[in-house]
Design a protein with these regions (language model features):
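An alpha-helical repeat/solenoid feature that recognizes helix-turn-helix modules
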Residues: 25-84, 98-138, 152-194, 198-254, ...
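Short, solvent-exposed mixed-charge patches
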Residues: 449-452
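Sec-dependent N-terminal signal peptides
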Residues: 1-21
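Active-site-surrounding "flap" and adjacent substrate/cofactor-binding loops of secreted or lumenal enzymes
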Residues: 119, 143-149
Length: 452
């Protein structure tokens, strides 16, 4: 472990302790109390397994990765092509997608801060192959761009002055700076981690552990937490070296448990009345939402389900891999029923051709989540429910290479969530390939609930 990592572990791993539950605290004005559901908080055991180690660089040799040597070489070449595409698209000020705002789910206004998050993700993509600010003008300009936007010397850290995308921006910055491991960044890294833990929904906003918002992260102005924002936060905390025992991670595990389609551990009515398939939905907040339910014609809230049928929500790919990965980062054992149920869902819906439940929508976001999740699971081969064994690295690399354009870029024909933009999709694809060729560690397999 580097000196930088040790310093950051000491500085950011001990976040503020869990505040005592206090019913006298007023509920935050952004929350519509009439929409919040309450159940007894799920049981969140202490950390039962060592979370996967943070790996910050791709492997230097094919022998370090459990995939075909040809796949490793193809991935390295593909990554280089993608990075050259991004290098050519970098703005003179060091950023990507500058002046192209984005709006989060249900956000009315587009925020220009999206460029800061995307620039941070691109910086991480360059850093993971060894292009760092001290040896790469591209990386140096990207870091300077980030510093200038979120608070330089004498200014408070503010990831999104417009308010909507702060969690995404702060998370991307934390992950990027952690990947660089430069002591010069320790103040900004600490600020981004502190911002994330301060803006998590908990008792300080009058949200008790009984409420379906508790432990999640969301968009700043609309407030309502969701799994996409929460997994970004947990990625950042993991990358920055924050302990799985940290109160922020334990709070997030409450939210994760409530987002899973698993009645044994989730008391929400939509989980009890649904498939109980172990997958994950978009959010449990305000009674629950799922984009897969929307895609199936049942309404995002399950409000279009036929009269007389119990309300339920459909699980889908990107959120299931996000939840699975996040539970591993939170220190859940692979024998935990929540982890096993999520893994069983993955085995039943094995594909890289689409985002299961949403088709082409969010496909590259999905592939990035898949790659991080399966690297975190530390399993080289996944056996699907039909009994077919899959080397996920070989298959993921082949899938991404088949979609790469001749100029080194990737783009999604389904433009939802900004995936019609080649810069964003290329960043997702490069990050996914980099996860696939990071050095692997051996670990015990995840057993499905039905396994002997």
């Amino acid at each position: 472990m580097s000196v930088f990592s040790v310093v950051m572990l000491l500085q950011v791993a001990a976040a503020s302790p869990l505040p005592p539950q206090d019913s006298t605290l007023p509920l935050d004005e952004r929350i519509d109390r009439s929409k919040v559901t309450e159940q007894p908080p799920p049981v969140v055991a202490s950390v039962s397994a060592r979370p996967p180690s943070v790996v910050r660089r791709v492997s230097l040799a094919a022998a370090e990765v459990p995939c075909a040597a040809s796949s490793w070489h193809a991935a390295r070449a593909s990554i280089n092509q993608g990075l050259e595409f991004l290098r050519a698209r970098q703005d003179a000020g060091g950023g990507w997608r500058v002046w192209k705002g984005s709006a989060g789910t249900d956000q009315r206004d587009r925020s220009l801060a999206a460029s800061t998050a995307i620039t941070a993700l691109a910086l991480k993509a360059f850093a993971q192959v060894g292009e760092l600010p001290m040896n790469s003008p591209t990386a140096a300009r990207a870091r300077d761009s980030i510093r200038s936007r979120v608070g330089g010397t004498g200014r408070a850290f503010n990831p999104d002055p417009q308010g909507g995308l702060g969690n995404y921006v702060a998370s991307a910055i934390a992950s990027a700076l952690a990947s660089i491991e430069d002591p010069e960044d320790r103040v900004l890294l600490r600020s981004s981690v502190e911002w994330l833990t301060m803006h998590q929904w908990d008792q300080t906003e009058g949200v008790s552990p009984r409420m379906d918002w508790f432990g999640g992260a969301g968009y700043g102005r609309s407030g309502r937490p969701d799994l996409s924002n929460t997994q970004m936060m947990l990625d950042a905390l993991h990358d920055a070296g924050v302990s799985a025992d940290d109160p922020a991670v334990r709070r997030a595990l409450v939210f994760l448990t409530r987002t899973q389609n698993l009645a044994e551990t989730n008391a929400a009515p939509w989980a009890s009345g649904g498939s109980r398939d172990g997958g994950f939905v978009y959010t449990p907040a305000n009674g629950g939402e799922s984009f897969a339910s929307e895609a199936a014609g049942e309404g995002r809230f399950g409000e279009k389900i036929a009269v007389g049928q119990p309300r339920s929500l459909r699980s889908y790919g990107s959120m299931t891999y996000a939840g699975f990965k996040s539970m591993l980062y939170a220190g859940l054992s692979k024998d935990d029923p929540r982890v096993q149920a999520a893994f069983e869902w993955i085995r039943r819906h094995w594909t890289f051709r689409e985002n299961p439940g949403l088709g082409a929508q969010g496909h590259f976001y999905y592939l990035h989540a898949v790659s991080r999740a399966l690297h975190a699971a530390q399993q080289h081969t996944i056996t699907d429910v039909q009994g077919s064994a899959h080397n996920w690295r070989d298959e993921l690399i082949a899938a991404l290479l088949s979609m790469q354009a001749s100029d080194g870029s990737w783009v999604n024909s389904a433009s939802r969530w900004d995936e019609g933009d080649s810069e964003l999709c290329t960043i997702y694809a490069v990050l996914a390939l980099e996860e696939a060729i990071k050095p692997a560690q051996e670990a015990a397999p995840v057993n499905s609930p039905a396994a002997p």
